[in-house]
């Protein structure tokens, strides 16, 4: 495997990056971080990915792996763990930019596969580990360690170690079938249980659960303040979506078809991520030894 970088807005750079390779794993999926209208976010995300797919069409690639998101899968109406098969019949009603972007990119990937590109979708669940800049899921560890996490919204999640997710994506590239999704799943946990594990690891008090409607009001106020020139919101729409719109996940398909089994526990994943954050100056509070 070889890591290459290219700007998704630069088609020539993408084509040059893909020279002399026979497969590509795209780990640059768009992630809304700063408040913008959801339609603008979707337009940007799809345009960038279309540049990627257009570059791929000119090359003899045997596999293209899009790194998807579990939120793009509709929840099981019976409450059972979700799997790869369900697909929204229409655009999701909730206008969360994160949900809308990930749904649109999932649909785009499936469409490209139907049009003949060898696109396979690998979907790691909520990921913790090293080499995280801390602006997505790693924020839960960083902010709780720094005593700056305002609270959490309860919900259902599946959590996997980043290294295991990486191995899984390689297996998707090696053995996944074009046009198929593969969930790379770890442990099913409520957000309350997950935040509790993080709190124990960093030696911080357990933060309070925030009702979903309260979190949305806080996010709306902070977004309004940001648009008037204030600081970036701490309670973002994307963070609320990550916490509240998830579901437990069934990873049986990847186990059967790819032989994928996670090896690192959630506790170890949190500890490894924390050590990396400490070593890179992202955690500043004094921690429990």
Question: Predicted segment positions?
Answer:
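Conserved catalytic-site region of short-chain dehydrogenase/reductase
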Residues: 33, 70-81, 127-134
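Conserved Rossmann-fold NAD(P)-dependent oxidoreductase catalytic core, especially the SDR/UDP-sugar
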Residues: 44-97
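A conserved pocket-lining segment of Rossmann-fold NAD(P)-dependent short-chain dehydrogenase/reductase
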Residues: 90-92, 140-160, 164
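NAD(P)H-binding glycine-rich loop region in Rossmannoid oxidoreductase-like domains
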Residues: 1-47, 55
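Substrate-positioning beta->alpha
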Residues: 104, 135-136, 153-174, 180
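Mid/C-terminal beta-alpha module of Rossmann-like enzyme folds, strongest
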Residues: 168-234, 251, 256, 265-288
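Conserved beta-loop-beta element that borders a ligand/cofactor-binding pocket
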Residues: 68, 107-130
């Amino acid at each position: 495997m070889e890591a290459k970088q290219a700007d998704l807005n630069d088609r020539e750079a993408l084509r040059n990056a893909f020279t002399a390779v026979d497969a590509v794993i795209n780990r640059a999926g768009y992630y809304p971080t700063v408040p913008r209208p959801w339609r603008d976010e979707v337009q940007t995300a799809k345009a960038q990915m279309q540049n990627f797919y257009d570059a791929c069409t000119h090359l003899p690639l045997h596999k293209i792996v899009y790194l998807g998101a579990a939120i793009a899968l509709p929840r099981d109406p019976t409450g059972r763990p979700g799997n790869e098969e369900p697909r929204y019949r229409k655009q999701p009603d909730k206008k969360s930019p994160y949900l809308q972007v990930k749904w649109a990119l999932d649909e785009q990937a499936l469409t490209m596969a139907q049009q003949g590109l060898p696109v396979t979708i690998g979907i790691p669940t909520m990921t913790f580990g090293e080499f995280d800049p801390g602006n997505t899921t790693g924020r839960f560890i960083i902010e709780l360690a720094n005593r700056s996490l305002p609270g959490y919204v309860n919900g259902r999640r599946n959590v996997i170690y980043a290294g295991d997710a990486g191995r899984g994506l390689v297996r998707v590239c090696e053995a996944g079938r074009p046009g198929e999704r593969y969930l790379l799943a770890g442990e099913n946990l409520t957000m309350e249980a997950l935040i509790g594990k993080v709190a124990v690891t960093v030696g911080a008090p357990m933060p309070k659960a925030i009702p979903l409607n309260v979190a949305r009001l806080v996010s709306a106020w902070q977004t309004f303040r940001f648009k008037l020139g204030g600081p970036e919101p701490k309670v973002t729409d994307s963070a609320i979506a990550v916490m509240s719109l998830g579901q437990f996940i069934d990873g049986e398909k990847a186990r059967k078809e790819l032989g994928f089994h996670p090896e690192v526990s959630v506790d170890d994943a949190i500890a490894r991520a924390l050590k990396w954050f400490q070593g890179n100056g992202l955690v500043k509070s004094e921690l429990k030894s």
